[in-house]
Amino acid sequence: MELSVYNIKGEDTGKKVVLDDSIFAIEPNDHAIYLDVKQYMANQRQGTHKAKERSELSGSTRKLIRQKGSGGARRGDINSPLLSGGARVFGPRPRNYSFKLNKKLKALARRSALSYKAKNNEIIVVEDFNFDAPKTKAFKAISAALKVGEKKVLYVLPEVNKNVYLSARNLPNTNLILANLINTYTVLASKNLVLTERSVAVVNELFKA
């Protein structure tokens, strides 16, 4: 698959870049995507939720009312789950939500997500760019020129670039990621994908089947 390369002014440079068909042109596997996104979101959970159960509360164990003769139900002590401020029955406990997936399945999910983007014409390739100093206005101008600023956009960079990162971090709907860290969730969470020429080379090399 070939895509045109644009400059930061949004103009077609006349150059073409090749996207590996084993990454960007496969038949997407929806179930693999589902599992990978489910794992990503599960791994983000802290799992620190906790509610005290009856044995963990401090308070008097004296019975509030006598066992029989009141005509009502037995109440027990002040920590009873039946009462406001009492214990929780089967309350949440701290737990680890993360789970493992096979590397091959995760790779298939990532290629499926990228193939969906390519199929829907939501991938743009630009020339490599840099800033001498952090310039949010300059980065915003690039998004405007490429017509991707109104919806969520993910810029894929070949390497860490502090000035580019600082220029983009305050822009709404704009995220940056390194080419070697692309994952299924991040790709699908954005409407458009903007790759630099060197990013394409990294993706083609690392993720080809």
Swiss-Prot record:
It holds the Pfam family Ribosomal_L4. Keywords: Ribonucleoprotein, Ribosomal protein, RNA-binding, rRNA-binding. Residues 45-80 are annotated as: Disordered. GO terms for biological process: translation. GO terms for molecular function: rRNA binding; structural constituent of ribosome. Part of the 50S ribosomal subunit. Belongs to the universal ribosomal protein uL4 family. One of the primary rRNA binding proteins, this protein initially binds near the 5'-end of the 23S rRNA. It is important during the early stages of 50S assembly. It makes multiple contacts with different domains of the 23S rRNA in the assembled 50S subunit and ribosome. This is Large ribosomal subunit protein uL4. It comes from Porphyromonas gingivalis (strain ATCC BAA-308 / W83). The gene is rplD.
